Amino acid sequence: MIIRAVPVGIGHYLPERVVPNAEFEAMEGLETSDEWIRARSGIERRHFAAEGETTSQMAVTAARKALDHAALNPDDIDAVIVATSTPDLTFPSVATMVQAGLGMTGGFAFDVQAVCAGFVYALANANALIVSGQANRVLVIGAETFSRIMDWTDRTTCVLFGDGAGALILEGRDSAGTPQDRGILSTDLHSDGTHRELLYVDGGVSSTGTTGVLKMQGKEVFRHAIEKLTKTADTGLAKAGVTVGDVDWVVPHQANIRIISGTVKKFGLPMDKVIVTVQDHGNTSAASIPLAMSVGVGDGRIQPGHLLVTEAIGGGLAWGAVVMRW
C-alpha cells in the first residue's frame, strides 16, 4: 500500500463586479471592441475585485467553501499552500493570512509563486508533503487580483485578465498504487528563466520599488505554450501509466481559447472533454485551474473516478502538469 493525495473538497469565489467587454469598448484611447476581444481570446466577461478587496480575503472565502464541501473544520488542515503573484503585502505570505482568516491554530502555511502555473506547482508541493508523511490534509489555493497590475492603455493585455480564487483540499489515503485508484497519479514541472522578457511585471521591491504593470509578448507566449503544454501533459500521462484515451477531462489554465483549443487539438482530444471557463472568468492566473475544477464539480461534469489532466504555463517561463483521479 502507498499513500495517495486524494481530492476531498473544492470551492471558489468570484468578486461581485462583472466586467463585460463593453466596458473596454468605452475606454477612451483603448481602441478595442467586444468582437475583437472574443475573436482573439474567447473572453466575454471577467470579475474584478472591489476597492479594498484583497487576494487573501478572496482566498479565505474559497477555502471556507472547500472546507464545507469536504465537511471539515479549519483545524483539520495540516498545511495551507497559496499560489499567487498578487499578494496583499510583500510579507507575510497570503497563506498565513488565510490561516488567520480561517481561525487555524496549528499547521504551517506558505506561498508559491509561479504565476499562471502556480496552482500546478502548489499541487505538486502538496502531493509531496502528503506522500512523504509530512502532512495528511493540505488546503491548496490559487488566488489573484490581476486587475491591480494591468496597463490600462495596452489593449493586448488589459482585456485578458480577471480576479478570483479557487481552493482544493487534498487528503492522504491508503492506495494500492494503481492508475485506477483515486488521487494524484503524477506531477511534471519545468521552468526556463531565459524567457523572462516574454511575460513579466516591470516593478518590484528590490528593483524599482513600485508595483509595476504586466508586460507580455503574446505571439511568443502562444508559441511556447502550445509546445510546452502538450509535452508536459504527455509526460504526466506517461508517468501516471495512462494514455490520452483514458482522459475524462482536461482542466487547463484558462489563458485564452486559442491556447486551450490549440493545445487540446495537438494533444489529440476533442473540446467536449475540456472544462472551459475563460469566457466567463478571463485569465485569472493561478486561480484559473481551481476555479474551472470547482465549476466542473459543481455542474456535475467532474465525477468521482474521472481522470483529469491539468496543465499550465506562466511567466518565468514556468510550466507543468498534474494527472489525478478525482
From Swiss-Prot:
Keyword field: Acyltransferase, Cytoplasm, Fatty acid biosynthesis, Fatty acid metabolism, Lipid biosynthesis, Lipid metabolism, Multifunctional enzyme, Transferase
SUPFAM superfamilies: Thiolase-like
Pfam families, A to Z: ACP_syn_III, ACP_syn_III_C
Domain of life: Bacteria
Chain intervals for the UniProt region annotation (ACP-binding): 254-258
Residue pairs linked by disulfide bridges in the UniProt entry: none
Subcellular location: Cytoplasm
Pathway noted in the entry: Lipid metabolism; fatty acid biosynthesis
Record bears the keyword Acyltransferase: yes
Catalysed reaction equations from the record: malonyl-[ACP] + acetyl-CoA + H(+) = 3-oxobutanoyl-[ACP] + CO2 + CoA
EC number: 2.3.1.180
Active site as annotated: C116, H253, N283
A GO molecular-function annotation: 3-oxoacyl-[acyl-carrier-protein] synthase activity
GO terms (BP aspect): fatty acid biosynthetic process; secondary metabolite biosynthetic process
Gene Ontology CC terms: cytoplasm
Cited InterPro entries: ACP_syn_III_C, ACP_syn_III_N, FabH, Thiolase-like
UniProt keyword Acyltransferase present: yes
Self-association and partners: Homodimer.
Comment field on protein domains: The last Arg residue of the ACP-binding site is essential for the weak association between ACP/AcpP and FabH.
Family affiliation: Belongs to the thiolase-like superfamily. FabH family.
Alphabetized HAMAP family for the sequence: FabH
Function description: Catalyzes the condensation reaction of fatty acid synthesis by the addition to an acyl acceptor of two carbons from malonyl-ACP. Catalyzes the first condensation reaction which initiates fatty acid synthesis and may therefore play a role in governing the total rate of fatty acid production. Possesses both acetoacetyl-ACP synthase and acetyl transacylase activities. Its substrate specificity determines the biosynthesis of branched-chain and/or straight-chain of fatty acids.
NCBIfam families in the cross-refs: fabH, PRK09352.1
Name of this chain's protein: Beta-ketoacyl-[acyl-carrier-protein] synthase III
Organism of derivation: Jannaschia sp. (strain CCS1)
Gene name for this UniProt entry: fabH
